Amino acid sequence: MAQLETDLKSNNETTQVESERVLSFEFRGDGAEYFKIWIVNIFLTLITLGIYSAWATVRNNRYFYGNTFVDGTSFSYLAKPLQILKGRIIAVVVFALFVGLAGAFPIAGAILYLVLGFAAPYIYNQSLAFKMRNTSYKNIQFRFNGDYGEAFGVLVIWPFLGLISLGLLYPLALLKMHQYRMNQTAYGTTQFVFSAQVKSYYKIFGIGVGILLGILVLAMLVLNGSGLMSPNGAAVLAGFVAYIFVVTYFTVAFTNLVFISTSLKEHGFNATLTLRGYVKVVLINMLLIVITLGLYLPAAKVRIMKYITSCIELHERGSLDDFIAAEKESVSALGEQLGDVFDFSV
């Protein structure tokens, strides 16, 4: 009997493994092809005094979304240029009013900035709602169902607590931000679920601090010992090098953690970025951008996108086609425009 139960359990596990399909993300863009889009966007934006920037944004997004594939199907970017242009016009007007009032009437300006601070969570929510509902995969749109109170917490309260705790609560603040964004996002009618634990965030921050201190000490010893730089110059260079490595480590570690900790119903994700692989791509990009006086920038964006997508997988258990597209949410036009203009992207 025990043997029979063991065999049945083994068969069930085998069936479960066989029913899972690992789908790799793939970016099929080309650096030379994107360069043509990039250079035309810059030229037209300049000669139209910035008006074409809305069309440039749409062209860029449609290129990158349309060249990102999963299971043979690409993503789609649905936003229209005029939606973005209206938002940017409103943003310029609001910004000009703020600057003008702050200069002429400092007290009134301070009050308006305070109002903007309280409006930021609303703008953030509307911005993400706009971006998500203008992103689709297999003709099913994404959604973002934001809550003002939660947004205020992750944008204002938790960062403030991180500040007054001298950074000790920053890992928890970042966890709250990731939880809010992922748990409020849906594909069709199905919500994403984010299950990362706070200890993972503290572990990453701890390693990051260790890398920072280690590089600072090593760089200072090498630079001071060589006699090529003054102590102040050595400190500045060491700080710059340490900053680059720590930011790179955080990018790799948190990208992996967010994907691994995110699920969509029974479907899961995996990310396997490595510090070595990412640093290699970043250093090559920086070198070629400097050598080409910035002309390699479009190809650099394509190169980093290719690397990141090549390290991301969707573990499909069942069929994604079973998801039902949610009805389009009626997002306030003013909220969309302000959010798009102020570009509250994470």
Describe the residue ranges of each PLM region.
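Hydrophobic alpha-helical segments of membrane proteins
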Residues: 205-221, 249-257, 283, 290-291, ...
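Membrane-interface extramembranous regions at the lipid-water interface
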Residues: 3-40, 55-90, 125-155, 173-208, ...
